């Protein structure tokens, strides 16, 4: 059954202007259901009662839904008696109007087309209503900053879109699903060179074997305590995707300026000590040659976008991601550093609900654009009090919603951070705490902090040879 979405405001439109509507389409939808009640299932996912312009039509549609909820069939007599018992029959024109709806419906077989007309007119009215709200906010700001008014306007427009967007076509017969599945398997089996990687390669062999790559529409959480290297690890994933994929990578760096991110990437790909790059001191001819080679890689394939705006809202981030997506015909990967630095207007008094809204919006973005979204996250300090300081899912700060929304959760643990005499110096564990469509477990990587780089554990070759 269709449900009303309370996010869409119900405001009166400007007086003297008739809002978009089609009484004929509304009558044909209602009449079609009365003539052939089975058609309810064809249109109930498309419409809600508030989509009807005429008040009587809203009542009729709502009471049809209520009839079905009580397990009663929809027909002329049942509906009329149901309305009469609630003292609503006269509000809809009585039995005569219901009979007229049944009599004057042009073609029951076209009911889906009529429903689409009703839905589209309702969307136009929603847009007009939101526009009026925005105009009113602009005339009387009530102390709001322009940035907040703009964010609220975009949120309301997106709410209309989100209300109407469905992620699938409803129930499908297993034969149709099986056919698509076999086609997908056959395509993968005939594609050479993917080595079982069905998503965006991480650049790390052992991790790719565990995950089959970073999958489209997945929300991927990378979490660690400070100094473990979560930004370095996430940027390594982005660098690999940017240089190997046909479509660009978009990085939202809410904590670090774009130039610092770029310095880290130069150190990572050039294998030049990042302290030399950061200070400009001690660089020899060999270092400059390596840096020049890396710059050539980016010049030949400028596939990395960095937005270092701080305090982004989900609406702002989504808008910017859509723009880059549209301008480039797609994206291969989105990374957010880090989730807790985002803000969601309207949730200032409840941090848990704010994080839930941010997490939900990032997952929605991944599904909308069909792109893997990596979000870095902080961990609770309480794990520092344990003997085994390897993170688990419950260590995620404001963990409930993040853990629920994530498709893949990866923690970074380096024993040498806690144990000065560790036998695993220069080794990092990538702990897969959750994987919706794959195994959990651990992967060991080499950590080369001076280069701002993680590597396959036994790897000593020059990574630039890959690109």
UniProtKB/Swiss-Prot annotation:
Its EC number is 5.6.2.3. Keywords: ATP-binding, DNA replication, DNA-binding, Helicase, Hydrolase, Isomerase, Nucleotide-binding, Primosome. GO terms for biological process: DNA replication, synthesis of primer. The keyword Hydrolase applies. It holds the Pfam family DnaB. Disulfide bonds: none annotated. It catalyses: Couples ATP hydrolysis with the unwinding of duplex DNA at the replication fork by translocating in the 5'-3' direction. This creates two antiparallel DNA single strands (ssDNA). The leading ssDNA polymer is the template for DNA polymerase III holoenzyme which synthesizes a continuous strand; ATP + H2O = ADP + phosphate + H(+). GO terms for cellular component: cytosol; primosome complex. GO terms for molecular function: ATP binding; ATP hydrolysis activity; DNA binding; DNA helicase activity. SUPFAM superfamilies: N-terminal domain of DnaB helicase, P-loop containing nucleoside triphosphate hydrolases. ATP binds at residues 224-231. It comes from the Bacteria. Residues 193-461 form the SF4 helicase domain. Homohexamer. The main replicative DNA helicase, it participates in initiation and elongation during chromosome replication. Travels ahead of the DNA replisome, separating dsDNA into templates for DNA synthesis. A processive ATP-dependent 5'-3' DNA helicase it has DNA-dependent ATPase activity. Belongs to the helicase family. DnaB subfamily. NCBIfam families: DnaB, PRK05748.1, PRK06904.1. This is Replicative DNA helicase DnaB. The gene is dnaB.
């Amino acid at each position: 059954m269709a449900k009303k979405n309370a996010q869409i405001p119900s405001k009166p439109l400007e007086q003297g202007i008739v809002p978009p509507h089609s009484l004929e389409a509304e009558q044909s939808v209602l009449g079609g259901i009365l003539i052939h009640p089975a058609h309810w299932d064809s249109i109930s996912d498309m419409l809600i009662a508030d989509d009807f312009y005429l008040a009587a039509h809203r009542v009729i549609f709502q009471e049809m839904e209520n009839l079905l909820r009580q397990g009663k069939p929809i027909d002329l007599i049942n509906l009329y008696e149901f309305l009469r018992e609630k003292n609503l029959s006269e509000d809809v024109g009585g039995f005569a109007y219901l009979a007229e709806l049944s009599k004057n419906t042009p073609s029951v077989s076209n009911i889906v087309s009529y429903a689409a007309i009703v839905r589209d007119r309702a969307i136009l009215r929603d847009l007009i209503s939101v526009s009026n709200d925005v105009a009113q906010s602009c005339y009387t700001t009530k102390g709001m900053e322009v940035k907040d008014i703009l964010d609220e306007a975009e949120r309301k427009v997106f709410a209309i879109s989100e209300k109407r967007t469905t992620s699938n076509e409803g129930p499908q017969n297993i034969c149709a699903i099986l056919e698509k599945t076999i086609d997908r398997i056959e395509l993968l089996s005939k594609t050479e060179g993917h080595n079982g990687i069905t998503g965006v390669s991480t650049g790390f062999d052992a991790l790719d074997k565990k995950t089959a790559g970073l999958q489209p529409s997945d929300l991927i959480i990378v979490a660690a305590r400070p100094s473990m290297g979560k930004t370095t690890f996430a940027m390594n994933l982005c660098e690999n995707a940017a240089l190997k994929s046909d479509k660009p990578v978009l990085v939202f760096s809410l904590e670090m300026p774009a130039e610092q991110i770029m310095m880290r990437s130069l150190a990572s790909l050039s294998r030049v000590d990042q302290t030399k790059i950061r200070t400009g001191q001690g660089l020899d001819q060999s270092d400059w040659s390596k840096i020049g080679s890396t710059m050539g890689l980016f010049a030949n394939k400028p596939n990395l976008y960095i937005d270092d705006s701080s305090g982004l809202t989900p609406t702002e981030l989504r808008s910017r991601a859509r723009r880059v997506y549209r301008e480039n015909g797609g994206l291969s990967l989105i990374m957010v550093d880090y989730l807790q630095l985002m803000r969601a207007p309207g949730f200032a008094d409840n941090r848990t609900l704010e994080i839930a809204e941010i997490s939900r919006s990032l997952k929605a973005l991944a599904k909308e654009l069909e792109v893997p979204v990596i979000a870095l996250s902080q961990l609770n300090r309480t794990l520092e009090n344990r003997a085994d300081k390897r993170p688990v899912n419950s260590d995620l700060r404001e963990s409930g919603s993040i853990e629920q929304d994530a498709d893949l959760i990866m923690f970074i643990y380096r024993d040498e951070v806690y144990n000065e005499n560790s036998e695993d110096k220069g080794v990092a564990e990538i702990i897969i705490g959750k994987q919706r469509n794959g195994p959990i477990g651990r992967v060991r990587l080499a950590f080369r902090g001076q280069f701002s780089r993680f590597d396959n554990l036994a790897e000593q070759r020059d990574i630039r040879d890959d690109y």
